[in-house]
């Protein structure tokens, strides 16, 4: 199987969410229809990340859901995840804790996690 990995990075606050959502939807639709299998790698650190995740979920539901996975990549084990693990697993297809960043100081963990996501991606948005 040909895996196509996509990472998303954006701002904590989004000024025009409807415009961003439409642009994301167009890209995600194209990927779902043209790639054998797509792995959508996302964080959970702001409005953009949440917008991406909800758009991927909606596109999977309305376009195609048999050739992709929505993967939350955490920089380290968080209290939010630990206290809500079941809810996280209901929302995301997979959850990964980046081993490289989990071993780093928390102030640099996001940067290390982001670099790891980029390194495993075929496309970065």
Placement of each model-derived feature along the sequence:
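Acidic/glycine-enriched connector segments
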Residues: 1-125
């Amino acid at each position: 199987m040909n895996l196509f990995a996509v990472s998303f990075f954006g701002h904590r606050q989004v000024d025009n969410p409807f415009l961003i959502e439409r642009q994301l939807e167009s890209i995600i639709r194209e990927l779902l229809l043209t790639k054998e299998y797509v792995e959508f790698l996302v964080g959970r650190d702001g409005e953009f990340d949440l917008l991406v995740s909800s758009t991927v979920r909606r596109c999977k539901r309305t376009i195609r859901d048999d050739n992709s996975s929505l993967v939350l990549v955490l920089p380290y084990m968080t209290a939010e995840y630990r206290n809500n693990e079941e809810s996280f697993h209901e929302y995301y297809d997979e959850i990964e804790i980046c081993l490289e960043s989990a071993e780093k100081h928390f102030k640099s963990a996001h940067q290390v996690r982001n670099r790891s996501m980029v390194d495993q991606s075929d496309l970065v948005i």
